Amino acid sequence: MKIALTCMCSLLLTFCAMSQNTEMKLPAPQKTGGMPLMEALSKRATNRSLDPARSLSDQQLSNLLWAAWGINRPDGRRTAASAMNRQEIDLYLVGRKAAYLYDAKEHSLKLVAEGDHRSEVSSQDFAKNGDWIVIFAADYDKMGGGNEA
């Protein structure tokens, strides 16, 4: 597991080193409406039969990223808690055409690598058929423990 995580992080760092200043601004997230939480939890299930022809709309992607790691308060705090508010997580999206880093402050995607790198970041065949692979990567330096983890 540590080897796989190390390889994935190395690949992401390589993507970052190759990055261009290309940015994709996302639409504002829809913060009201939707399915009630308890209903969503009761319907939650894993589906490994992914249709490669289906894709998320920009609005769906915006909502998903904001819910996962967006900023929901004026002081910059997030929708998801982090220990001691260190905000050590980076969220990456790897898709058919490119890999991106989610910039929560700008609610945008920053290009880190062109091309389809899904097979390089997942060993699970079903994931390669999905529209996006979401990667949460922790910056150990922000955690206060350095490389101890």
Describe each PLM feature range.
Residues D141-A149:
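Amphipathic, heptad-repeat alpha-helical segments used for oligomerization and assembly
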Residues T6-F15:
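Bacterial N-terminal signal peptides
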Residues M18-G130:
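N-terminal amphipathic, basic helical "cap/leader" segment at the start of enzyme domains
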Residues M1-L5:
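Positively charged n-region of N-terminal signal peptides that target proteins for export
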